[in-house]
């Protein structure tokens, strides 16, 4: 199982939100580059970075910080937030990003998604963020009428190989992931599923591993030290 330490960028800083509410932010580190280096030194094999400002405005706002992170670490970096054009994908890849996560665009711009997958294959990941089982977009401000399962099936049919699933109600809460929704998702598609939102303990990570979930994104639990990164990496290595 892959462990993805999370760095959420807002106004150039590393922050955490509560249930996706931009008004409920906590600054975890004023220097996201330093935070990336810390995670790498603790043994992280890959980083998950989200441009929260970008998710709202629809373009990469924190690109200079993202580029600095990519240059500062030797491990792969995957980026999401506001990526809604091929030019945006190409720009991120050109500054050293390994994989790009599409969210809103995957739902509303099928031709862009198909072209991105055709050109960049497994480097394109789709983020599916759900509220009460329905897909939320544009920085989680809008909720669509499509279920997360239906969108996941559509993504699989297009050729997407990996999806990141977030239950927004769990994000930043340390209340545990939505195991029920993840289990249904895992049974509904044959592509890799990365779980995100609410993970608070190594026991929960083990349970996700037992469900054959491909990876887990851990944010608040690392910053608040309810999960020790070195320990969870060791545990998942042995699983």
UniProtKB/Swiss-Prot annotation:
Its EC number is 5.3.1.16. Gene3D superfamilies: Aldolase class I. PANTHER family: 1-(5-PHOSPHORIBOSYL)-5-[(5-PHOSPHORIBOSYLAMINO)METHYLIDENEAMINO] IMIDAZOLE-4-CARBOXAMIDE ISOMERASE. The active site is at 8 (proton acceptor), 129 (proton donor). SUPFAM superfamilies: Ribulose-phoshate binding barrel. Keywords: Amino-acid biosynthesis, Cytoplasm, Histidine biosynthesis, Isomerase. This is 1-(5-phosphoribosyl)-5-[(5-phosphoribosylamino)methylideneamino] imidazole-4-carboxamide isomerase.
